[in-house]
């Protein structure tokens, strides 16, 4: 870039147009503070600058005013000049660069400017009353004076006029102190000094959200993102959007031969900018542009070396965002948008001169331009301006649904991508969108009005646009003390912009604005200025008309008296307008006590102020912010824009081809259009993405404008754009699905670790070294998975790159590249880095202000500019080597050359390769963003396009035969290494003629034994995918599988597949010749090459790799399970039979009349059709058997059995409300507070999975657990889980493998027990009871069906609805209770269970069911009879059961008579007895008269009054031999004995019951022996210590006397005691021992009894675990005999008592 020639001093002001002057004169008497030019910068006012003139003199100047794009500068010699902002930006200096000399010169300059101001006041005193402070954001509205001639201006005239305009800025603070304003409202949770930057940046991002592709967000979330000290998606998306816009701007500048922009782009690859690497680009951009200069940016430089960007102070973050937003104002797209808005609202300016991009510089604006929702193109004329404003106001308010003169009032193109197609029209603004561009799921679109994201945020957040889309804030005026009053984002902002004042910022919400107005109007000085400010504030916020400015009028009168009545006409007219609006009672007339509460003082206002007050109650503290909930859906629109642009380029290339006859038919034209779209979409489809646990990269919606999306709704073709994106990421998605969750958390570090694992998995076959063996590979993967810091990931990444074969990397990875890096020394050049003159020392007179780096400078000269330092090393990694190379060179003392460096012959500067540079960059990475960038560099250097077989459908088939076609049947059959060069032997199959370009690369042709030719080629000339397949087959790592099978033995299914391939013998022989053996895939039944197959872990069949899913578990070891789709969808349920305790109570047969209801799942034929198809003799029950209709698909029946209710045809309810409330999609961020837990697998919430909610039990489940696919979600209208439906719950695929294995073991044990004890007639899987053909109906059923045939459905696997042909009919004769004669007989007893089944309607509502049995047929109501065996209850608790505990009714409830004749049901399913609605059956009710006779005397009168709560025995109190306590539960004598036996067991097994299923018998042995061994060790210790203390003389007083026979019962204890106490002591009558001896003896005795191999003692359990149950019986009998004999021959009767006590109930 050439140095700019400085402008001559004394440049005249721009000439004003006459119509502009007339417009300002006409508007002068009106609301002047609002009629100003668009917002312009304020940051340059009051700044100091140094400028070098042609006479080699450097003058210090000060910017004093601004007018019509020009800044007035006064120099220290008294001269002045008007410059543009582009010239000033490079000349401004900050306070940190002022030395003592410059400070003295600055003070003299300030005095000179002050003298000019005083002289101007004396010469023109009338201007003080006429000119009011009218600056907006530091912009002074042009005051029209009568002295202007309009033709030419001298230097002195321009200086004086400029001084008049800037007089209000440089006046020193008057003697009267400024008015003390109330404190800020405190509703924004950031420091006050940063509020201005916050509102400015937020308004800018909201105003240009479409141009920047930033999905709108609330101010509260923005504050939370700034405060969050870790990575968050909102802050990442904002920075990425801003930097991408700047990237395009730099590219345009580079194309215009801008040296600075070119070097900024060449220093770092901007194509790698993403949500993880953007901090590196931010540092590089700020350093290149000189933004991070000055001591206040030291913490920013520290971030580059040490800390993360997110930990910066919130003020620093906002300053960085402010600078980025300022620089984006020069982006071409943004300037076009601003011009279009200005043209549509203000009108086209024919005299406007377009400023070149090179001369545009960032403008800092306070506040920003605001956005308009209805974007108008440049063709909009002045006549349609009013209509556009009406549409704007309708969008902003979002209230009315009026439409314009168009048909629907909405645009015909998507607002984001600009394409037509299927659009979603907003009801709040005239915009339309593709659902994919804004990330809206169609199933969640309500039936009523729908509002776009912009309108939704406008309703929630503060208002950005105010009357015009070119102004984001309204300026109310500036007081004499330099405080500017602004209205923005529904807040009053007060900025101190005076040169000598402090940067004080205060803000007030709507509730506090009245306080500010009261304080200003009560000021004793400068009343005139404050009245104008208060008037503008009152008008802007629509304060109630009852609030007048009466006190302001009094202040005006006093001001007039002080100024001798010299008031301008404008002031008089304004005060007259104010007085006309006043009323008798105002807010200022209220007492002082009411001023403290402005909400109660300001009443009776308009609706506008009330609405704003409601909005003002919202605080923006960011307390509820969650870091990963925001999802920038507008990036989908950016992808669509790129796809449309690529398609346009391809279409233009096709139209320029001369052969136009190829489109002679519409079919060929459509085919060509489809091919063009496929090519265009494939070019822009991103291959790379950072994996995340919440799967935000998943896009479900269609684009709306491709060829497939434009077809009719009946077409089942998928979206072509989605297909291209899915094809580009298909391999990565398959691997990523099994990686999460990793052990290093859910942050960005886990994404980097997951991608490193993906690189290793994708390059299998092209990685050598330790990755070829399984054990080192496992250790490496474990190291990556457990890495918790950035430093921990460096070593695995470097190890991975070190072992990648060079053939898999591009050639640029090994090229020398330091030659162009040295050119980028601009970042270390002091003049260019700072962009302003450096600090000047004494005697230094000048320095060039615009130093440019010349491109023709030599490398040596460029290198001498480099200053070194940590900052430059981190940014550009100059002169940085990897640590191993540096240490080795240091040990050698510099005597040898460093390996990996190219020293060359002509240059003395060694050059590094890209690989060496990358290694040094990885080792010097200090934060996550730097490491992520290096991962992306490595990923970019891999030859991804050649790793997979290319798709020939998208290849350009024109011209000669492509390499893809040549190698389509080729395979590598051999490999050899000679002279460190690798060659491969390629077999081309049946291809006999090869092109010349292939033959010239052939090194040797070798004949094989089967007379085939093997062509030897170097590895560089062989396709990479062939090398990968060959190397992977040679060094295939056997992944551990759950099914261990001999490698040489084929399964039955594999043999069947291979046998089927032999049916066509000729094709098989040809395939064997070409090594192309095929077989049918076990999943999809299509052909698959045997070399490309993978084996399913379940069915052991050959399958496509795409037909399988891989799941990895890292519980200590890497465990990979490969499951084909067929096995995953058709997993057979393990039969589970619920065995319960065997009932010993008398059997009661209870005839219960109830309503039969069915669940609408499977259609039922009308009875008339079934009667004709069935024989009368087979249908003995008189009820039609239910058969599923064939029209219902099998897949749908399987899904229906899990409780999903589908949408029916011709039903108005679409289920939108149910899906909005009860289905939580993966990555959905509109419900951040909802984190459900799956009710089956009990795993914590995973944002990457979809959940569905049961409306009955309020539990959530994974959609995969209920067999619900994502494509079927739009058809769901309801859901009720399996437990609520009383069916067996399926297994969740995300269940912990250990928990899943335990459940399977329980089911197997459950099934085995049921089979041993005998089936009671009800199978829990088939859910059908044994047929009872002897039951005949007494009354036939009605001929007409009770339900319409289309509305009656019955699930196949509902256990509550058994086959009616197999239900025992209860006739009226057996209505009363009957006492079974086999009450205490062994075996399973029958007990009927009463259940009610609710009907599921399509609208997911449950109205009150009506009886389906007519009154005359009530007695034929069939109860459901089931049998319950309770013998296995000790092994299971209710949590292990397949049904809920409510299924097990108490005997009191079951014995309660039900004479209601069929109760009705509420909506929640609870039964209400029709006879007495207030009756609620409980377990504490007393027995009624009709419960049954006494089981002792068999008498019904009087009624039995005692009921055993355990066994259900019903007797009279006078017949009972057992006593009964009043008010307590009663149990019979046998149950009391059982309870007594279980209580007296004590520690013998009672407190060591197994609460869960043991995995194997060895575990049972270990557990059984652990307790006795521990007790024996403790007892022996106590016994030994006690014996030792017994011999001590000091412990004589603690000894006790015991009989000596105590030690004669055990040989071991007797010998130990004899050795310790002596022979004489043990032969005496009594022995003196310590009490610890007795305690140890008792413990050993107890342990010995506990080890007896009988019953449930630990010894019995150990024997059972070691030898089995039959061995325990043998050991038990032998123990009983031996104990009996021991009791007869010895004095101890304790063993026999223990035997009676323990073994009696086993």
From Swiss-Prot:
PROSITE patterns: DDT, ZF_PHD_1, ZF_PHD_2. The keyword Transcription regulation applies. It comes from the Eukaryota. GO terms for cellular component: chloroplast envelope; chloroplast outer membrane; ISWI-type complex; nucleus. Gene3D superfamilies: Zinc/RING finger domain, C3HC4 (zinc finger) (3.30.40.10). Its main location: plastid. The keyword Repeat applies. Residues 394-408, 1167-1194, 1311-1323 have a biased composition (Polar residues). InterPro entries: Chromo_PTM (IPR056618), DDT_dom (IPR018501), Peptidase_M50 (IPR008915), Tudor_AtPTM-like (IPR047365), WHIM1_dom (IPR028942), Zinc_finger_PHD-type_CS (IPR019786), Znf_FYVE_PHD (IPR011011), Znf_PHD (IPR001965). This is DDT domain-containing protein PTM. Residues 148-160 have a biased composition (Acidic residues). Disruption phenotype: No visible phenotype under normal growth conditions. One of its GO terms (biological process) is proteolysis. Interacts (via the DDT domain) with CHR11 (via C-terminus). GO terms for molecular function: methylated histone binding; zinc ion binding. A zinc finger (PHD-type) spans 411-458. Residues 1-27, 144-168, 375-408, 1165-1194, 1311-1345 are annotated as: Disordered. The chain crosses the membrane at residues 1539-1559, 1569-1589, 1596-1616, 1624-1644, 1682-1702. Residues 1-16 have a biased composition (Basic residues). Residues 192-252 form the DDT domain. It is found in: Plastid, Chloroplast outer membrane; Nucleus. Keywords: Chloroplast, Membrane, Metal-binding, Nucleus, Plastid, Plastid outer membrane, Repeat, Transcription, Transcription regulation, Transmembrane, Transmembrane helix, Zinc, Zinc-finger. Residues 375-393, 1325-1336 have a biased composition (Basic and acidic residues). A motif (Nuclear localization signal) lies at residues 9-18. Membrane-bound transcription factor required for the plastid-to-nucleus retrograde signaling. Functions in multiple retrograde pathways. The plastid-to-nucleus signal plays an important role in the coordinated expression of both nuclear- and chloroplast-localized genes that encode photosynthesis-related proteins. In the nucleus, activates ABI4 transcription in a PHD-dependent manner associated with histone modifications. It is a multi-pass membrane protein.
